[in-house]
Amino acid sequence: AANRVSTLFGPDAVLLILPADHLIEDQSSLAESVEQAVSLAATGKLVTFGVVPTKPETGFGYIECDTPLAPDCFKVRRFVEKPDQQTAQNFIESGRYIWNAGMFCFTAGTMLDEIGHFLPDTLNLARDCLAASHHGTDPDHHVVQLDASTLHKIADTSIDYAIMEKSEKIAVVSARFDW
């Protein structure tokens, strides 16, 4: 997606990646968090969203917040996969951890730079796939039918593990919405 968006709109175009299965009813709080994320993304950050925990939860991943970058925005110290109950309780008590919402915001150029740094082969394969794919002609919709013969060559890897947990450019917006 970052490759296509960069081609169409330039490397400073901002992408917002949201899971389809999240229900966020407080749209004004979501909009505020997105505005904060867009501002951070414009400075070259890969931004993730965290939700302030209401209880120890072993079914969610956590983000440890580091130094503040702006109100409710922090440099990320580390990501922690689903902890046990006692560790989750310790996280809540520390006040430094928030739930990982699995939502992202970044410029196309920053993401492409990080993919190129951590996964150069994947970036080259993705560019090959995009070049071989069918691009729709409707000027109002940028539909791409990915080429299956080149797509299957790209490793199936999570953005969390491949980029977010390795990059030094990660920031988190501590969102105030429930999800």
Show where each model-derived region lies.
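Conserved beta-loop-beta/alpha segment of the NTase-like Rossmann-fold superfamily
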Residues: A1-P68, F106, L112-F118
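Catalytic core of tubulin tyrosine ligase-like
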Residues: F60-W179
